[in-house]
Swiss-Prot record:
Gene Ontology biological process terms in this record: phenylalanyl-tRNA aminoacylation
Gene name tied to this protein: pheT
Catalytic reactions of this protein: tRNA(Phe) + L-phenylalanine + ATP = L-phenylalanyl-tRNA(Phe) + AMP + diphosphate + H(+)
Native source organism of the sequence: Phaeodactylum tricornutum (strain CCAP 1055/1)
Annotated binding of Mg(2+), by residue: D366, D372, E375, E376
Keywords of this entry: Aminoacyl-tRNA synthetase, ATP-binding, Chloroplast, Ligase, Magnesium, Metal-binding, Nucleotide-binding, Plastid, Protein biosynthesis
Family membership noted in the UniProt record: Belongs to the phenylalanyl-tRNA synthetase beta subunit family. Type 1 subfamily.
Record-given protein name: Phenylalanine--tRNA ligase beta subunit, chloroplastic
UniProt enzyme class: ligase
Length: 706
């Protein structure tokens, strides 16, 4: 909004106020000065300011409104315009008018006035000058009066040619109403465009003849022209949301609709109407006005807001600091003065230091809570006049269990050499997985579905990194994955996924690089769960969604000791690796973070065992068994028969090849024996191993190898 300082000075005495001081006060008060304009009007130099206000301060979008704000900031008394007092006797007249039919929620006030005896439509020169100083080119017709009132008071008025209205209704009298348009009806507007309407659009009608789309634009057949001698003036307050909805639907925005969209109050509508008629009477002293009809919906009674001095001090802080570290805060007397400046009615309780403040209706949209009143006090005092101090922390926050779990996992993965990555939860439908959770109205085709796994995004990142000529990237990610139906049973679970391997590792410069093997990669995942103190076991992968990107024979599901499936681990499928141009010796994992957290919370008691000071005895055990026998089963049998001295079992080798029968495999196990009470003897351990061999022969038909 462009405002002329000369016009402002007519309403407030700011002759002695420095321009820089004015700009600083306005900016700190929430009205940013975007540009300073130097104008020359009738050989007189003037200064204008381009000001923007926040969305909730629609009351300041006029010369009168911004003048009241400047008066509050500089503790000046604004001049009361004569027409404010002169229009008071209109209030009773309007109450006795014909009530029009209208929507209580969409039209908050409606007043119509008839003017007759318009002979001279010339616009006074001083009005034209003020329009120019506000960035509006005068047209020297009725539109200038509309624009001037909009600038001065903030209220938009609609003008209709009364003679044309009479010719349309074909009766000497007519009634006004606000009705919904009929579906399929048409409206030819003053901008020469024909609009097709439906029943969501409201129309202002005279005897059921549409004369305007409510709050937006007039009917082309009843607009004013240079020979208009009588007027029907509409002054109304419409719901901001309704006007916004209609404007968007019809793809039309006018000065009227733009003003309604920012919300208006009916507080000074009658005064603005009186001012408009007074301006028209300057060139038409014999002008006759008659009230036609009116309707006002009673506004809600606003409850007082209690403002507490202690809260003001806590929020805004001190204004000064003495040398003895004593802090000085804004005084209750100063707060009272600021409330008076803002024209807020209040009752002050000196015993409790509370103000019971009644907000004027024109500020009811932006001041609804105590914190809003505190902001007003801060604005008038100047936020830059408060000391910048950090608040005292009463209690130190604790890291919750979720954070602690993440920290443990992240620490291990970072130590593995992995980098934390972040991807969008919205992905393209063209991934390795069939994403059936589609968005109804996606912004981009690449972000049209919700991801059902973290792994496709990780693979695409590795591929893109290699395309840029970089080395293989090993990384992990925390993120939510989705399942179910987006309309009914959509579930969202947090997972941690990762990708590693694919590079040749050298122990020294002259040796040939070695790729990460399956058991080494699997061992890294087992080590993670050892760090978390969680027992797991492995099962053959039966997850259908992983078959497209995990190796059919080198992938497995991970289960907790409780039997809950918490994720999957495997090597990249060779076909997909070839398609993406990646190494097939890349490994992926995806773990249910929520289940891991639940399991860790259940492990509340940590049991520590004494470290043995006695030596260990290690024995190797080799045998051939059928392929379908799981290692878990063997482990249970050996631990059950290895006595209390058996402390650890390690799988050293799994061999399939020459001299091994079909559908069989050769295993080599390393058994570690140790006692907490004595030094074990070899003959003692030999008896245990001999018994283990016998048990394995009986239970799993193991063929022992010497």
């Amino acid at each position: 909004m462009q405002i002329s300082l000369k016009w402002i000075k007519e309403l407030i005495d700011i002759e002695n106020v420095d321009l820089d001081d004015l700009i600083e006060k306005l900016t700190l008060g929430g009205f940013e000065v975007e540009e300073i304009l130097e104008l020359e009007i009738n050989n007189e130099k003037q200064i204008a300011l381009e000001i923007s206000s926040t969305a909730n301060r629609s009351d300041s979008l006029s010369i009168q409104g911004i003048s009241v704000e400047i008066a509050s900031l500089f503790n000046k008394q604004p001049k009361v315009c004569k027409y404010f007092n002169s229009s008071l006797n209109w209030q009773q007249k309007i109450k006795n008018l014909t009530t029009i039919r209208t929507s209580k929620t969409e039209c908050l006030m409606f007043t119509a006035v008839i003017l007759e005896g318009l002979e001279d439509l010339t616009v006074p020169k001083w009005i034209q000058n003020k329009l120019v100083s506000s960035g509006i080119m005068p047209l020297n017709n009725l539109v200038d009066f509309q624009n001037y009132i909009l600038l001065e008071t903030g209220y938009p008025f609609a003008f209709y040619d009364l003679d044309k209205v009479y010719s349309k209704v074909r009766t000497p009298t007519f009634s006004l109403s606000i009705e919904k348009a009929e579906n399929g009806s048409e409206f030819f507007a003053s901008n020469q465009i024909n609009y097709k309407l439906d029943n969501s659009i409201f129309l202002v009608q005279a005897n059921n003849i549409p004369i305007s789309i409510a709050g937006i634009i007039e009917n082309d057949e009843i607009i004013c022209h240079s020979k208009t001698s009588s007027l029907l003036i509409e002054g109304s307050i419409f719901s901001a949301s309704k006007i916004r909805q209609q404007s968007r639907k019809l793809a039309i925005r006018t000065d009227r609709s733009a003003r309604y969209e920012k919300s208006l109050k009916s507080t000074y509508l009658i005064e603005a109407l009186y001012r408009l008629i007074s301006l028209l009477r300057i060139s038409n002293p014999s002008l006759v006005y008659k009230f036609h009809s009116s309707n006002k919906v009673l506004e809600k009674v606003l409850k007082p807001i209690v403002l507490n001095y202690k809260t003001i001090v806590e929020i805004l802080g001190p204004i000064k600091k003495r040398t003895n570290e004593h802090l000085i805060y804004i005084s209750p007397e100063t707060v009272t003065d600021y409330l008076k400046r803002l024209n807020f009615k209040f009752l002050f309780d000196s015993s409790t230091l509370n103000w019971e403040v009644t907000i004027p209706s024109i500020r009811s949209d932006d001041i609804t809570r105590e914190i809003d009143l505190i902001e007003e006090v801060g604005r008038l005092h100047g936020f830059n006049n408060f000391l910048t101090m950090l608040p005292q922390i009463k209690s130190v926050g604790r890291a919750d269990f979720s954070y602690q779990t993440r920290k443990k996992i992240t620490s291990y993965l970072l130590n593995m050499g992995l980098t934390e990555l972040i991807h969008y939860s919205l992905v393209s439908n063209e991934t390795f997985l069939k994403n059936e959770i589609k968005l109804v109205n996606p912004l981009l085709s690449d972000c049209s579905t919700l991801r059902v796994s973290l792994l496709p995004s990780l693979l695409m990142t590795i591929q893109e990194n290699l395309k840029q000529g970089n080395s293989i990237l090993e990384g992990f990610e925390y993120g939510h994955v989705f399942s179910g139906n987006i309309e009914t049973t959509l579930t969202e679970i947090e997972y941690v996924g990762g990708i590693f391997g694919g590079t040749k590792i050298k122990s020294s410069w002259f040796e040939k690089g070695q790729s990460l093997k399956w058991f080494e990669a699997k061992g890294k995942i087992e080590k993670l769960f050892q760090q978390l103190n969680l027992g797991i076991h492995w099962r053959i992968n039966s997850q259908t969604y992983t078959k497209k990107f995990l190796h059919p024979y080198r992938s497995a599901e991970i289960f907790l000791s409780s039997g809950k499936n918490i994720g999957v681990f495997g090597q990249l499928h060779p076909l997909l690796a070839n398609k993406l141009g990646l190494s097939s010796e890349i490994y992926l994992f995806e773990l249910n973070l929520e289940l891991i957290q639940q399991s860790l919370q259940q492990n509340k008691l940590t049991i520590y065992s004494q470290y043995s000071v006695y030596p260990k005895i290690v024995k190797d055990l080799s045998f051939i068994i059928k392929k379908n026998i799981k290692f878990d089963e063997l482990e249970k049998i050996i631990y059950a028969n290895g006595t209390e001295f058996l402390s650890q079992i390690n799988l050293l080798d799994d061999y399939k090849g020459e001299f091994i029968p079909e559908k069989h495999t050769s295993l080599c196990l390393q058994l570690t024996f140790q006692s907490n009470k004595k030094t074990l003897e070899n003959k003692e351990i030999d008896r245990i191993v001999k018994n283990l061999k016998r048990v394995l022969e009986l239970k799993v038909q193991a063929i022992l190898r010497e």
